[in-house]
Amino acid sequence: MEQERIMQRIQKDVRALLIASKNGLSIHELEQDYRMMIGSHIPIRSLGYKSTMELLLDMPSVVKIHTQLDGTVKLSAVVDETTRRIADLVSCQKDRCTARTRNRRRNIRPRCPVDLVRRGRVSPVLPATVKSDLRDLLSVSPLLLSELEKAFSSRFGRSFQYTRYGFYSMLEVLRSITDIVEVKQTRAGSLLVLRNSETGRISASLCVKQSQLAIDPKKTSCVLEQCLKEPRTPEKKTSETVTYLKVSPPEPQKLSSKESPSVTRSTSPLINSSNKEQRLKLNVLLDESLKSNENKAPPVTNFTSAVPSHNSVLSNSLVGNSVSSETLFTKMSRPTSHVEADHSAASEPDASVLEWLEKKLEKELKLCLARKGAGGSVSDALRMDIQHVVNQHSDGLKISQLPTVFKSFTGKDLPFKELGFMSVMELVGSLGDILCVESTVDGKDWKLFDAKKKDLVDEFSAGLPSTSSILSSWNSSQQTTTPVKPVGTIFSKVDEKLWWGPLELKLCSTEQIDIPPDAVRNQKLHCLPSMKRGFMIGVYVENIESPSQFYVRCCGKDTSEKLEDMMIEMRHCYSNECVSERYIVTDNCISVGQIYALRVPGDVWWYRVIVHDIKNSELLDVFYPDFGNVATVKKSWLRFLKNCYMKIPAQAVPSSLPYVTSTEDQWSAQAIKKFQQLCSCIPLVGMVLQYVQDILHIFLCDTSSEEDLYLHQLLISQGLAKMEPEHACKKISKKRNPFMQYLTPSQEQPQEESSQLSVPSESSQSEIPCAKEVKDEDDLGMPYLEAFPSGSDVWDENWAFSDGACDYDTAPTIPKVDTQKQQENKVSQETQPFKFCIDSADASVVHHPLEEFYISLIKSRKSQESTDIQQSPPTEEQHVAEISHRSATEQLQGGSSSSMLCEKKLYYEKEDLPYCQQSKCSFSPLLGFQRLQIPRSATPVALGPAARLATAGRLLYWASEPR
């Protein structure tokens, strides 16, 4: 009835909303209008529907569903006789959909908004790097304006986003680069041409003439005469000057007397004559002299012309055009046959010449590539002014003083912003061909020097090879091979990351590699805090070598879950190529005992590892502190570990199974294999016994099946191990874990306490004191596996393990109670093993989950109420004692309390077998302790893992039903 009433109300509201809408509503609009009118959502869940559409399909008398062409759904109301008049009035309303649509379109923002940079009165400037890209693009060939963006994207791999720099249109961009780009109107459209193309035309004509000379060398003189007659415009040192760079050994300073003075004048690279025609005539005379002396000794110019003409490099350069023209025409005037003959006669140069060639090539490439970059946008006039200002300061000019000195020299500001540079440092860095930058003594500023003068000083200080050694090595008949190193160039000394050349040279040249500031250096991981005796914890068994030597990893929010989260973060971090390259560990940073991050190829996870041994230059042994494994890996797989991944302590704890030993001198392969099968891929319940020399002795129990399996008991029952009569502490103390030296004790537990737990005293072995405190779950950061009631309604709630090892010859005693009957039966209790039987109350009395009434056999609170123990007369087979009723108060969450009376009977059973024979039959390590019987009427779930642990240890078992 309630659902029918709700359904009728919803139909009424939906009909009202749809009738009021002239053009219908979508499902989303209907839900929104319903929420605005009623104040709550449509109760589809309470009516048993999964969606609003499913609800509307069940209301055909109220809603019409229309599917439009674009796939959207529109809802309209079904009009009946009672609502027809209202529907007619709504249909006569004035349609305002146009205004609504217009307003909506104004408010709609694009998914990927592009906000233009709002500027003030200052006109935007295109950055120098972008100018350099445009100049490089147009230097190949002119482009139409419509094809500019496509060509820019195909050449540089990115789009030309001029709006990022403050421009609103391409017209503004072209206006800002009128100094390098010229727009010409053609029939095809606006054509973008690079300005100052005369130099390009001259270089092109030179290339054509050179190719003609290579085909017909006899026409050399005619071509030279034609070049002399051609009118030559004065050369302008612009950014688009294209010349031929020639790599040659150094020119000799002294010549023999047999050589003509014309040869001396023509081969000197320091000729400074204003008459260019005279220099060309000298080159013609040089060619004639070379032809006349074919059979004579080769002149000194052989090593100048020995380099073939096709090996010259075509690139932008700042080398003087006059010197380049001279060397070019000198090469062109030499016939090809003579060049080949001299080249075959010449021998390999020595190491000094090759070193000079390497430096020369490096310098030439640096000049060419620097001019090709952002520095090409700087005009020659500004270059000369900056160079002149720097030359006035022989000791160097500070970069911070350059704008002031430049203004005092030229009377105007340094226009670095107008050229597209963000700072003076960026401008100076682009002028690496004319300026040299060095750091000051204090390291707070930079000094500028003239690059040419600096190179001359360096060459003079380093010393050039002598002329005689060069000539003798060049003209000698002996053939020697000298390996030539690849050349790498740093474009700017300000930013040394601008590297051109093989990456190996850059890595070798860097003497000191930067180590990330958050990299872990000379630190140790912390161990997990030591657990008290009798503490129960879930564990994973790792790296099993034998039942006496394995590792355990604790389960819990503060241990295994945090480790998984850390590994996920490490995978996300180190999977980035930039981060992985930054944290690469070099050979000089690898040392034994240091912790690093490691990923083996084929695996997706990163692990924390500690270097244990370095085998050779490539391989090393590492220890996994979180899993206990040892593996051999390559050095290249290591990465520096970030400091944030050192918070979690090492998770692997070296452990051993107590009270069991191998049947022979060593553990058999069958026993090790069986132990590995029992521990594989499943969490186990572990109970801490003690620590001996940092090795945890722990009992392991498999509770995944219906019947609990205790590993030490199973190994002994199958004959794979034997019970140890005494715990071999002395033997184990000699076997220290070698990997514990790489870890440091936990900060949560002082070292004094851990030492007391690891080495038990002799006095503690004779008696077992009562535990009065229970370790809190949050102290160790471990999940507490069981709960127990606050009342002390079982005999063993004040009983706990001692800090020392158990003595098999002495049976533990029950805590003293101030009753007369207990004192009378004290002798029989100390000399005979007992069995206890407890009859639990009916399960219907329990008002809370059964897990809250777990029985703790390990730790509990002290009893708050006294108990009266009544003992029945002993029979021949067993001693029976009955315990009176006791009440235990349980605190509830809401503040209310409820009491439950548990009637329990305590029976003492006398065994026929002596105690020594009973120890042989029992496989539990806790020998000599009292046994507790539970009737089968009790609920097994209420026992918990602690009681199940005692059951397998023959301390707790089911009592036989009374007949």
Swiss-Prot record:
Native source species: Xenopus tropicalis (Western clawed frog)
Protein name: Tudor domain-containing protein 5
Function comment: Required during spermiogenesis to participate in the repression transposable elements and prevent their mobilization, which is essential for the germline integrity. Probably acts via the piRNA metabolic process, which mediates the repression of transposable elements during meiosis by forming complexes composed of piRNAs and Piwi proteins and govern the methylation and subsequent repression of transposons.
Residue ranges, compositional bias (Low complexity): 745-767
Residue ranges of the region described as Disordered: 233-274, 745-768
Domain Tudor: 589-648
Gene: tdrd5
Sequence ranges assigned to domain HTH OST-type in this UniProt record: 6-79, 122-197, 378-452
Compositional bias (Polar residues): 254-274
GO CC annotations, alphabetized: chromatoid body; pi-body
Protein family: Belongs to the TDRD5 family.
Localization annotation: Cytoplasm
Major location category of this protein: cytoplasm
Keywords, alphabetical: Cytoplasm, Developmental protein, Differentiation, Repeat, Spermatogenesis
GO BP field: P granule organization; spermatid development; transposable element silencing by piRNA-mediated DNA methylation
InterPro entries registered for this protein in UniProt: LOTUS-like, OST-HTH/LOTUS_dom, SNase_OB-fold_sf, Tudor, Tudor_domain_containing
